[in-house]
Each structure stands twice: as C-alpha cells, then as structure tokens.
C-alpha cells in the first residue's frame, strides 16, 4: 500500500500540507508552522486567532487594526505618502455589504451612553451594551444574554434578582431603586456632556 499524497496546499507557503501537519482554520489549510499573524508573525493556534477576508491575525493585532481604522481593512496605518501634483482619480465603486457593517455605528450603550462598536456589542431586548457594561447592577457580576433578568431597564444576574425579590417579597423596592439608578445615570451623562463642551 502506498501513500499517494494530498492535494491540499498551505495558504501561507503554497506547499503541500500532509495530514500530520495540517491545521484548518475557516476551511483554509495551513502547515502548523505557517499559521502566523500576518502583522507580527507570531505563531497562532485555533484558540487565539481572528481572521478577516482570509487574512489571519493574533487577537491583539486584529483588535488594534479595528480600533485604528474603525473598519476591518486588511492594512494597518502606513506612514503618510508624499503629496503629488496629480489629482486623485475618482473611484466609482460602491462599498460591499460587509464594509457597511463596519463603517461606524450610531448604537449607544444603554448603561454608559457611549458608542458601541460591533466587535464589543451585546444586544438584548433591543438595547445595546458594551460587553464590559453588560453586568449585574447589584453586584457587578458578569452576565450573559442567556443568564440575566431586567426590571425597568436595569440589569441583574438571576441570582441577585431572585435574592432581592425574596428580601421584600415584591418588586416594588427594585422598581424604586431602578428609577433612582436611571436618574443618577442620566445626571452623570448630562454632567459629562456639559463638561465636554468648551467654554467660548
């Protein structure tokens, strides 16, 4: 019995990938040694990589790329090119549907009222939150969209929600507490907005 080989080629080096050294990410074949961040060249594993349009990055560089450019373009910011006398040709292309998803957002976090970008967004009950803001308002416990309770727009972990209900036997004190927290958050946001306006 003879081994006839494989037709799979490594995306990085374009050489044949044999089963013993095969790593498949997003349906693309790599040698284990060739599976590296396209920016820093550090070796990646299936548990610590992100990719966009077939380009793989370590998670820190993937996030940095998004934060620098506001979109998932393939390149990090490069040094400014010298200006030339030639006018820039007008592009007549329309952006792809995917580009529209990352071109910016108007979504504001229901907790801190700051802009929520798609990479950090959690949406529940038509409200958007930063992942870091999506936590129990009573104990600060981490919660998930499948494990939370909300009353009057205030988030609780199920444990604290049940505990607070059992203390009084009703939700009335929670509703009062929720309205106080909402008023405090609105006052804090208004004060921050006033402080951000420069004096003329």
From Swiss-Prot:
InterPro entries: Znf_LIM (IPR001781). One of its GO terms (molecular function) is actin filament binding. Residues 8-68, 107-167 form the LIM zinc-binding domain. Gene3D superfamilies: Cysteine Rich Protein. It comes from the Eukaryota. Keywords: Actin-binding, Cytoplasm, Cytoskeleton, LIM domain, Metal-binding, Repeat, Zinc. It is found in: Cytoplasm, Cytoskeleton. GO terms for cellular component: cytoplasm; cytoskeleton. SUPFAM superfamilies: Glucocorticoid receptor-like (DNA-binding domain). Expressed in roots, leaves, stems, flowers and siliques. Barely detected in pollen. Its main location: cytoplasm. Cross-links actin with a constant of dissociation of 0.4 uM. Interacts with F-actin. This is LIM domain-containing protein WLIM2a. The gene is WLIN2A.
């Amino acid at each position: 019995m003879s081994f006839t080989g494989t037709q799979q080629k490594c995306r990085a080096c374009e050489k044949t990938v044999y089963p013993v050294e095969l790593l498949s990410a997003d349906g693309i074949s790599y040698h284990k040694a060739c599976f590296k961040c396209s920016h820093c060249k550090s070796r990646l594993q299936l548990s610590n990589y992100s990719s966009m349009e077939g380009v793989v990055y370590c998670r820190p560089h993937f996030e940095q790329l998004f934060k620098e450019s506001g979109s998932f373009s393939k390149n990090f910011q490069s040094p400014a090119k010298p200006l030339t006398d030639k006018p820039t040709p007008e592009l007549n292309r329309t952006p792809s549907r995917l580009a529209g998803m990352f071109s910016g957002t108007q979504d504001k976090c229901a907790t801190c009222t700051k802009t929520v970008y798609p990479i950090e967004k959690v949406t529940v009950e038509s409200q958007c939150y930063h992942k870091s803001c999506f936590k129990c308002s009573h104990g600060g416990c981490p919660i998930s969209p499948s494990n939370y309770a909300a009353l009057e727009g205030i988030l609780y972990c199920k444990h604290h929600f049940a505990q607070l209900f059992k203390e009084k036997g009703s939700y009335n004190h929670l509703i009062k507490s929720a309205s106080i927290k909402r008023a405090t958050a609105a006052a804090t946001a208004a004060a921050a907005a006033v402080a951000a306006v420069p004096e003329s």
